Curated annotation (Swiss-Prot):
PANTHER family: ENDOSPORE COAT-ASSOCIATED PROTEIN YUTH (PTHR39179:SF2), SPORE COAT PROTEIN I (PTHR39179). This is Endospore coat-associated protein YutH. It is found in: Forespore outer membrane; Spore coat. One of its GO terms (biological process) is sporulation resulting in formation of a cellular spore. SUPFAM superfamilies: Protein kinase-like (PK-like). It is a peripheral membrane protein. NCBIfam families: spore_yutH. Its main location: membrane. Involved in sporulation. It comes from Bacillus subtilis (strain 168). Keywords: Membrane, Sporulation. GO terms for cellular component: endospore-forming forespore; membrane.
């Protein structure tokens, strides 16, 4: 039992374990809230960087940040049943109905831009082109092998048929990114900041305000904006239809976006990360999990025309009230292109 391991390593007696956001085991003491977070995927260097980021944000008086607790032996992590975990401490969560996700994220990024230390292992700034290129090359090589080795499962057939379309979209995203870096100049607000691996609807909400360092990377702020918008459009369509780009408006009331930021954001929306993640996850998953990814692929393939319209609408919105065309249009989007 993890209770016994934590008693041994930290001297903390756990009365009851529960779950935080269906993701992390957690427990409370009279004055504090603790999260038990798996960290086997991180190198020691990356964990150290995440530790210093959390300490920095705590020093900046971020009320929601969780911080690493050292074991009695002075270690940042502990082992349990062959896996590595960290114990994070936060203020007890409470609901905040006045919470504005856009404004709150802008303030979080503002603080993160002041982070004074170099970030290497957890750094992603300036790396999108290379990371996307590697992802494309790997899936393209896999796709070619699949084409040449029938018979195919239904998922294989859908992947084989759809990949050329998403390859084209991916190449457009990389070209858009390259053109942005050539044509535009970053401003002060375009410097690196503390971001999230995936900023989604449930990452922060009025009911879940805790900032979790294991979720973080150091990158350009547009990463979080794009991923939040993508996730909302794909998985919370009703909210998106009602609120539109309110999230982006709230963000810009705190930190207006430069043309460079807007173009980076748009290039990231263009890159079909959701397609790559579903296909990669399917082939890495157990048999019991495959049905979920089959359904997800069907959903995004049936939805690709609406996603193109979303991209066009996002481009138009980011150019509103601008004196010049900040975010160039991708001419073929929304022209009835097929998979």
């Amino acid at each position: 039992m993890v209770k016994g391991t934590i008693k041994e390593k930290y001297g903390i007696h756990i009365r009851q374990l529960s779950m935080y956001q269906h993701t992390y085991q957690c427990f409370q003491t009279p004055n504090s809230y603790f999260l038990i977070v798996p960290v086997s995927q991180f190198s020691e260097t990356e964990l150290a960087e995440l530790y210093y980021m959390s300490q920095y944000l705590q020093e900046q008086s971020d009320p929601y940040v969780s911080v690493f607790i050292f074991t009695k032996e002075g270690e940042l992590t502990f082992e349990h049943e062959g896996k590595t975990y960290a114990l994070l401490k936060a203020a007890p969560p409470y609901s905040n109905r006045a919470f504005s996700i856009g404004a709150e994220l802008a303030e979080f990024h503002r603080k993160g831009r002041g982070y004074p230390y170099e970030v290497k292992a957890a750094g992603r700034i300036g790396q999108w082109k290379d990371l996307w290129g590697k992802r494309i090359d790997q899936l393209e090589a896999f796709w070619q092998r699949k084409v040449q080795t029938p018979p195919h499962e239904p998922f294989d057939k859908k992947m084989i048929e759809s990949f050329p379309y998403y390859l084209g979209l991916s190449e457009n995203a990389i070209q858009y990114l390259v053109d942005t870096e050539l044509d535009d100049k970053p401003q002060a607000a375009d410097s690196g900041t503390i971001c999230h691996q995936r900023m989604e609807r449930h990452t922060w909400s009025p009911e879940s305000l805790i900032r979790i360092p294991a979720d973080w990377v150091f990158d350009h702020a547009s990463r979080d904006l794009a991923e939040y918008m993508r996730h909302t459009f794909l998985h919370h369509r009703q909210d998106f239809n009602q609120q539109g780009f309110l999230f982006l408006q709230e963000y810009e009331q705190v930190t207006p976006l430069s043309s460079f930021s807007k173009r980076l954001l748009y290039s990231r929306l263009l890159f079909p990360l959701h397609y790559f993640e579903i296909v990669e996850s399917y082939y890495m998953s157990s048999e019991s999990e495959k049905h979920y990814f089959e359904e997800q692929l069907d959903f995004i393939l049936n939805d690709c025309g609406r996603y193109e319209q979303f991209l066009n609408t996002a481009q138009e919105f980011m150019n509103m009230r601008a004196q010049k065309l900040f975010v160039p249009r991708v001419s073929w989007l929304g022209k009835g292109s097929s998979r």
